[in-house]
């Protein structure tokens, strides 16, 4: 009986090791795969947004009419919408999609405010420039964490 019990324990140990080894080799992912092109796109759009705010800050406040920046607003909006679409179609990518949606919503709010007031003050520009930097850093880090 002890021989049978020892044999059973040996088989149990072997099967446990095989099972454990197979589990170590398996990875269940609940996040999208890393995409270097998405990270580069985030950085490219971040640069455009930073340049946009830099240009506004370099322009005297009396010359910051919305019509002079309308095309830039539309180009950046289109880039953010394209990034949102790219993130949305990737499986397990809700966080990145939500972050992109936040950036797009902030951008649209800024555009509407500029359109309504037909100017933007320096303090608001500096604040919003920093906000976007934080959002884009979070987006890029989030994509990088998928590696």
Residue ranges of predicted features:
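Bacterial N-terminal signal peptides that target proteins for export
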Residues: 1-17
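Post-signal peptide N-terminal segment of mature Sec-exported envelope proteins
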Residues: 33-57
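Short, charged, amphipathic alpha-helical segments
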Residues: 66-74, 94-101, 122-130
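Heptad-repeat alpha-helical coiled-coil/4-helix-bundle sensor or tether segments in soluble regions
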Residues: 87-115
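Alpha-helical segments in soluble extracytoplasmic regions
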Residues: 54-93
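C-terminal motif of bacterial Sec signal peptides marking the signal peptidase cleavage site
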Residues: 21-25
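Short, solvent-exposed segments of well-ordered alpha helices
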Residues: 28-40, 63-70, 119, 123-126
């Amino acid at each position: 009986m002890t021989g049978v019990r020892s044999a059973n324990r040996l088989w149990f140990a072997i099967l446990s090791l095989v099972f454990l080894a197979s589990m170590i080799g398996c990875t269940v992912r609940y996040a999208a795969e890393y995409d270097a092109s998405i990270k580069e796109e985030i950085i490219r759009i971040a640069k455009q947004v930073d340049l946009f705010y830099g240009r506004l800050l370099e322009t005297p406040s009396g010359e910051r009419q919305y019509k002079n920046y309308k095309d830039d607003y539309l180009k950046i909006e289109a880039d953010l919408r394209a990034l949102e679409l790219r993130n949305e179609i990737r499986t397990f990518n809700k966080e990145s999609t939500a972050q992109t949606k936040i950036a797009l919503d902030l951008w649209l709010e800024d555009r509407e405010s500029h359109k309504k007031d037909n100017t933007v003050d320096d303090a608001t520009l500096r604040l919003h420039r920093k906000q976007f930097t934080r959002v884009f850093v979070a987006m890029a880090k989030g994509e990088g964490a998928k590696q």
